[in-house]
Amino acid sequence: MPAARYQHLDDPFWTSLLALCAEAGSSICEHYNEPSLAGKLRAKADDSPLTRADLASHTILSRGLAALEPALPVLSEESDRSEIAGRRRWSRFWMVDPLDGTREFLERTGEFTINVALIDAQRAVAGVIYQPLERRAYYGALGAGARCYSWRESGGEGEAIRTSPLSASTLI
């Protein structure tokens, strides 16, 4: 994917990526609205929960990102070993947490997101943080700024987010 593509926040690339996150978010909300939330499948190796919502979002995002940019591999928190074999050699890839805040999801706090980042040379160069219940996305790219888009409040482009430049000595 040419850098110029994601560095223009009006590019159709962003429309596709935001729609993909919204689709994954809708799937998560279907599970969230189940009466029992009995969708917990098991605990992962780190003892964090894994739900049907995690897996549904993972599937939607993995397939969608592969269609959006076929040459880029996807590293997802829910990927199995075969999907991420050779990841140390990847210089450009998608990094995904299909449901960040699974415990909060299970507790119904509403405090969970979908996180998608484009990594290039070990650096995040573009990304989306999507809040499924709010139907709101924060997205941006290195050198292009950031925007917020709400499907509830907007009918057009995302609203620019004012940011301050980082100094060379800033630690994050």
Describe the role of every protein-language-model region.
Residues W90-E134:
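Glycine-rich active-site/cofactor-binding loop and its immediate structural neighborhood
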Residues G39, S48, R103-E104, G110, ...:
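Flexible, active-site-adjacent loop/turn segments at secondary-structure boundaries
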Residues H31, E104, Y149:
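Residues that scaffold the ATP/ADP-binding catalytic core of kinase and kinase-like folds
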Residues S62, A85, F105-R108, F112, ...:
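Short, function-defining helix-loop hinge/capping sites that tune catalysis or transport
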Residues V116-I172:
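Acidic beta-strand-loop-alpha-helix segment within the catalytic core
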Residues M1-L99:
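N-terminal subdomain of lithium-sensitive/metallo-dependent phosphomonoesterases centered on the IMPase/IPPase/PAP
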Residues A67, G86, G110-T113, A144:
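Residues in and immediately flanking transmembrane alpha helices
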